[in-house]
Regions:
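Short, solvent-exposed mixed-charge patches
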Residues: 1, 302-303
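Structural detector for internal amphipathic alpha-helices that build alpha-solenoid repeat scaffolds
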Residues: 138-149, 172-193, 212-224, 245-257, ...
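N-terminal signal peptide c-region/cleavage motif recognized by signal peptidases
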Residues: 4-6
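Short inter-helical turns and helix N-cap capping residues of alpha-solenoid HEAT/ARM repeat scaffolds
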Residues: 176-177, 207-208, 239-241, 272-275
Length: 303
């Protein structure tokens, strides 16, 4: 991807993208001027988004949302490369310089083919998106969280165009559509848009982890009895995977209130207590990211 993490025994709990966007103060496109380990990464702003103006050259020399889970004392490093073109989500530090959320989040690298390695859900789950689509979706997302206003008609058109198609997989002739569908579903979630259950079922039933998670998460924006019952039955179904069940639990918790929390509490002992987590390489410093088992997810809900 062009950005590596040089952290041996340092691990952290990686935040979800929604939290990162909410807490960030600036969204910019920039060029990397230099990266010196003892100083930080100097970038030149190409353009800024939203009302928070940021121009010229600035220094990134810290992290704003870093929750360490282990440390060897070796320290953390910004390993960006000179001349890279990158989108950054930034916060201002007390020293007047700037911070990204963690060493592995809050940035999206623009590749030579003008695709962006984009994060909509979590840095563990990235998508290769055309730069035009990335800017269209992220401009709307950023404006929504910072000004409560965005071009709803344009974004809904993009979302509907992609989710009305048959769910795509990882095949060579499908992967581009898969990434667009991922961006569409996740953008709808981040913008608090409601998509009917009947339109999302095909993604939940499709044999693709990412499509399942995006659609189940998006049901968090619905508030009808049919959706609540659907989620509850999905959680009870032994054939469904633990990760997806946890997402369904969180969605049902948001829309179901105390009534469904009580129902979930009654079935928690029937659910798995195995934590599957995000998977990936055990040497990845993001292994400290908390992701509960279905049983633990219910136990962690507010009563």
């Amino acid at each position: 991807m062009g950005v590596s993490i040089n952290s041996k025994a340092e691990t952290w709990n990686e935040p979800w993208q929604k939290e990162i966007i909410k807490k960030s103060e600036y969204f910019v496109l920039a060029k990397v001027i230099s990266n010196i380990d003892s100083i930080g990464t100097k970038i030149e702003i190409i353009k800024y988004f939203g009302k928070q103006k940021l121009t010229g050259e600035i220094l990134i020399n810290g992290f704003s949302q870093l929750q360490m889970t282990s440390s060897s004392g070796h320290g953390l490093h910004l390993d960006f490369e000179k001349d890279q073109i990158i989108y950054f989500l930034l916060s201002k530090r007390d020293d007047g310089n700037f911070a990204i959320p963690t060493p592995s989040s809050g940035f999206a690298v623009v590749a030579e083919d003008k695709n962006v390695y984009a994060t909509y859900r979590h840095s563990y789950h990235q998508a290769s998106i055309p730069q035009e689509i990335y800017e269209k979706t992220y401009t709307a997302i950023w404006n929504y969280y910072k000004t409560s206003s965005f071009n709803k008609e344009e974004i809904i058109g993009f979302i509907n165009e992609n989710i009305e198609k048959k769910p795509a997989g990882f095949g060579e002739d499908e992967i581009s559509l898969f990434f667009l569908q991922h961006a569409a579903l996740e953008t709808a979630y981040l913008l608090d848009l409601t998509i009917e259950l009947d339109k999302l079922k095909k993604f939940i039933d499709f044999e693709n982890f990412h499509s399942n998670v995006s659609a189940l998460q998006l049901l968090r924006n619905s508030d009808d009895k049919e959706t609540k019952e659907y989620l509850f039955n999905y959680i009870k179904n032994e054939d469904n995977e633990n990760f997806q069940k946890v997402i369904a639990i969180w969605s049902l918790d948001k829309i179901g209130g105390k009534k469904y929390r009580k129902r979930l509490s009654k079935i928690k002992d029937e659910l798995s207590d195995e934590e599957t987590g995000f998977g990936g390489n055990i040497m990845d410093p993001r292994v400290g990211t908390h992701f509960p088992s279905p049983k633990s997810a219910i136990e962690e809900l507010k009563k």
